[in-house]
Structures are given as C-alpha cells and as structure tokens.
Amino acid sequence: MSYFEHIPEIRYEGPQSDNPLAYRHYDKSKKVLGKTLEEHLRIAVCYWHTFVWPGVDIFGQGTFRRPWQQAGDAMERAQQKADSAFEFFSKLGTPYYTFHDTDVSPEGSNLKEYSENFLRITDYLARKQESTGIKLLWGTANLFSHPRYAAGAATSPDPEVFAFAATQVRHALDATQRLGGDNYVLWGGREGYDTLLNTDLVRERDQLARFLHMVVDHAHKIGFKGSLLIEPKPQEPTKHQYDYDVATVHGFLLQHGLDKEIRVNIEANHATLAGHSFHHEIATAYALGIFGSVDANRGDPQNGWDTDQFPNSVEELTLAFYEILKHGGFTTGGMNFDSKVRRQSVDPEDLFYGHIGAIDNLALAVERAAVLIENDRLDQFKRQRYSGWDAEFGRKISSGDYSLSALAEEAMARGLNPQHASGHQELMENIVNQAIYSGR
C-alpha cells in the first residue's frame, strides 16, 4: 500500500466547491495574459519540508511517522521516499520538484559512499521523472546540517571543510544537469558569523567568492544551461549571513565579477526577516537585473524566525506577481513551495491541504495582478509622476549635460521654486484593493 493510496488526484472544481481535496481557483489550463496558469506559475514542491522534515522543533522530537523515516536500509528508504514523493507530485498535478542532495540520498560515512549513493538515487530519480513527466526545477547541496559546517562551508576556517563542500556541490550540480534541472541554487545557510570576535571578514568573503567562481567554472565546463541562483537570507542559523538580502547579494556579485553569472532565488519569509516586503525584494531584483526564481511561503509576523508556512495572503502575492508579470514572467525560475505543514498536522491529507490552498492563492494572485497590468492605472500614474524627467530639462540632467555648478546656475537663471505634488498613495492602495476584491 502506498502512503497516499487513499487520496484521489486533485482536480479543479471551481470556487463553489466544498471539497477540501480539490482546486477552487487553480485551473491550470486557464489563460491569463496569453499564458496558462500552469505556465505562469511553474509550481514546484520541495523535498525537504514535505518528505524529510520529521516534525521536530527545538523543544520536542518528531511528530510525523512517515514510512520512509522508519528504521531499515538507508537506500531502500530513499527509494521509498522517492516513490511517495512522485506519487504526491502526480496526484497534486504539480509539474516540478526541488531537492538538496541529502534530501534524496543517504549521506553515507565518507565521500565515497556519499558519491555512490547519490549516483544511484540520481538514476532512480531520472526513471521517476521519465515515467511521470515531472521535472526538476532546481537542485542544491545541503552545506549546513552536518556538524562539519558549524562554522560555514565556503567560509569555514578549515580548508578541508571547504573542499568537502566543493565535492558536494560538484556532485549536486552534476546531478541537476543529469536530471535536466532548470536552475541550481546556492543557499549559504551558515555562510556568515555568530560573533565578529573570532571572524576574519575579509578572508571569509574572499573564500565565498572563490567558491562561487569555482561553481560558475564547473557549470560552464559541464555545459549547464540553467541559471545559477543565490538565495538571500539575513540571519538564522547564523547571527549575520553574507547573503543578507537582494541588494547585498548584488553588491557582492558586482564586487567579485559574478553579476553576469548568478541571479537570486527570493524567499518570501527571508525577505521579511531582512525587514523588507516580498514585493520589495522582487522589485529590487528586477531593478538590478538579477531576478531568477521564488520560494513561496510566509512567516508569522509575531515570530522573529523562519516559520516557512504556506502562503495565504492573496494581497501580498498579487503585488509579487504584479512585478513578475510586468517583467515578462519566469524564464528558468518558478514558484517553489519552501513551505511545511505545522508540527501538529500529522495526517497525509494535511500535506495536500497545505499545497492546495497555497496553489489556489497563487492562481488568484496571478489573475488579480493581470487586472492591474491590463487597467494600467498604477503605471499611468508613475509615468505622469516622473514625466518631468522625460521632458528636455530632465533628459539633459539625466544624460550628464550639466555639471553641479552649471545646474545650480540654470536653476538660478530659471528662478526655480518647485512645489510638491501629491503622491496619491491612498488612491494607489485603493486601486490595488479594487483589483483584488472586485476583479477590476
């Protein structure tokens, strides 16, 4: 008997349905702005929260009793986990998945065992993909869970740890290539510090840059055509991480000549931990030319940590998709659910409830964002607000025709006395709410 045998395939039944195992808004074939919802969203389910996390927290042991988490041969359990995962993906109707190397494969007791196990499970995953049509959105390596990475991986004070991490990334990138992954993600879970008292900032930043250059070189060597992505996060588990937010990552990439090679994978909960909105981080990534992909989730505003809950705010998601759709949508990226059910949600159905609700919210957000784009009221106001910069005087300033003193003289000659014009923030907010709640 399979773990999800009693659960039917999840289908679209419309907004009037009371069936908790059905989509109310996600009609994957519905076209919005010329693409289907499936094409817009490129939904992925993550391996780690859905099939690896045992339901632990810092005060208690695991509450889940998944069959693949029980005692037995490690490789057999890995294959059982893959069987259950692909059954879940298939029944949910999601086209992509994501993983860390140690999510899918037993780590073993040394690098030789790690490599052999990972190669075997990569072949197994390839067969599962072929039989189901499900694809890999991105792969990555877990460089934060093992005690060897307590002081970081690329930023470790021990070069042997750096080399071990490089070996994992080499194999994870090779596996991603073998499985046709569209992206490879680098999340620096412990690439930061707990205290500056024992940290050499210059050395650690240089080490991280060297590591990233090695990853880029290997990607080119093996002919990887996907995108390389860094996932920003300000802190947790370390006090401060070097990939703090989108702007910080861009500055680091620019400093080290990597800005044309690596983009960002933006997680909603990481954005709020950094003191930003999800909307801000996506807009900033587009402004800097490094937008890549999204990890869809949310945090609890009353907690100061990464709770990785399923996204349930259509308002927040609408503004995120307003930016994404305005810039042409995803290319290699997609919406990966870096989300987990709560520790008390122990039934197999709960895994479906969490994803179904979140997918419906994403579908609604795409449709509402499309309304904002089609009515063009936000952009119309922006164009009018900045119209002075498109006139001759503004163009001459922007193009560098004036020096500081020349511009000051021009201002004096014109007798300039500009007055403030309303920013109409309240009107803009009303326009957004009208699109969300009235659909127009």
Curated annotation (Swiss-Prot):
The active site is at 100, 103. Mg(2+) 2 binds at residues 267, 270, 306, 308. Its cofactor is Mg(2+). It is found in: Cytoplasm. Homotetramer. Mg(2+) 1 binds at residues 231, 267, 295, 338. GO terms for molecular function: magnesium ion binding; xylose isomerase activity. It comes from the Bacteria. The gene is xylA. Belongs to the xylose isomerase family. This is Xylose isomerase. Binds 2 magnesium ions per subunit. GO terms for cellular component: cytoplasm. Its main location: cytoplasm. Coiled coil: none annotated. It catalyses: alpha-D-xylose = alpha-D-xylulofuranose. Keywords: Carbohydrate metabolism, Cytoplasm, Isomerase, Magnesium, Metal-binding, Xylose metabolism. InterPro entries: Xyl_isomerase-like_sf, Xyl_isomerase-like_TIM-brl, Xylose_isom_bac, Xylose_isomerase. Gene3D superfamilies: Divalent-metal-dependent TIM barrel enzymes (3.20.20.150). GO terms for biological process: D-xylose metabolic process. The keyword Metal-binding applies. Its EC number is 5.3.1.5.
